[in-house]
Curated annotation (Swiss-Prot):
Region span, Disordered: 135-158
Organism: Variovorax paradoxus (strain S110)
Biological process (GO), any one: translation
Oligomeric and partner information: Part of the 50S ribosomal subunit. Forms a cluster with proteins L14 and L19.
PTM text: Methylated by PrmB.
Taxonomic lineage from the root: Bacteria, Pseudomonadati, Pseudomonadota, Betaproteobacteria, Burkholderiales
GO molecular function: rRNA binding; structural constituent of ribosome
Name of this protein: Large ribosomal subunit protein uL3
UniProt key word Lipid biosynthesis: no
Gene responsible for this protein: rplC
Gene Ontology CC terms, in alphabetical order: cytosolic large ribosomal subunit
Length: 226
């Protein structure tokens, strides 16, 4: 799937559960609410230099929206949302949508399709190198004093005489944008506009996520091919 034709949906992580296949196998799935994705703007090559669909999700009080954004949304005739994102698409895909229209889950995804899910990972505060970078602790005894769970020496010799940027050290863990790739769409609840995605996705319950067709999905082999 090319990035130039990857229309996706915005959603909210509801939580995890498990479903059963016809064979009785338990499958862990993440429930994502993708209801009421509204098109706020259709960007074209002539006016914007690229083709994209601007989509909003959720709802926000009118008093919490800036005047420029309120005017932008009023032009499209849509209710203010909590987040706005753009999806680069082809001109044909953009021509199939209109500003103010609602995008249904089944019109973008299908059962068994590979998707990439992007979200903000759970923030865990200030963490040490063992938890943050999976480093090993030092010896518990035999000459080690008060240096059990520390990274050890981080410096260099007199030359270069400094700590290189990017050195793995203690610091804030989590609360960063993460993408989980090549997950399967296990089921689509069209009545409630829910995506049931096999496996775990980044973020905590209630967090916003972006679901796109997988860009590294391997092509499906034709039936009967060896």
């Amino acid at each position: 799937m090319s990035l130039s034709n990857s229309l996706g949906l915005l959603g909210r992580k509801v939580g995890m559960m498990r479903l059963f296949t016809d064979d009785g196998d338990a499958v862990p799935v993440t429930v994502v609410d993708v209801s009421n994705n509204r098109v706020t703007q259709i960007k074209s090559q002539e006016t914007d230099g690229y083709v994209a669909l601007q989509v909003t999700f959720g709802s926000r009080k009118a008093s919490r929206v800036t005047k420029p954004q309120a005017g932008h949304l009023a032009k499209a005739g849509v209710e203010a949302g909590e987040i706005i994102r753009e999806f680069r698409v082809t001109a044909d895909t953009a021509g199939q949508h209109k500003a103010g229209a609602v995008i249904a889950a089944s019109s973008v995804f299908s059962v068994g399709q590979k998707v990439d899910v992007q979200g903000t990972s759970i923030g865990k505060g200030y963490a040490g190198t063992i938890k943050r970078h999976n480093m090993s602790s030092q010896r518990a005894s035999h000459g080690n004093s008060r240096s059990h769970n520390v990274p050890g020496s981080i410096g260099m010799a007199q030359d270069p005489g400094r700590v290189f940027p990017g050195k793995r050290m203690t610091g804030h863990l989590g609360d960063v944008t993460k993408t989980t790739q090549n997950l399967d769409v296990f089921r689509i609840d069209e009545a409630r506009q829910l995506l049931l995605i096999k496996g775990a996705i980044p973020g905590s319950k209630g967090g916003f996520v972006t679901v796109r067709p997988a860009i590294k999905a391997k092509p499906q082999a034709a039936e009967g091919a060896k």
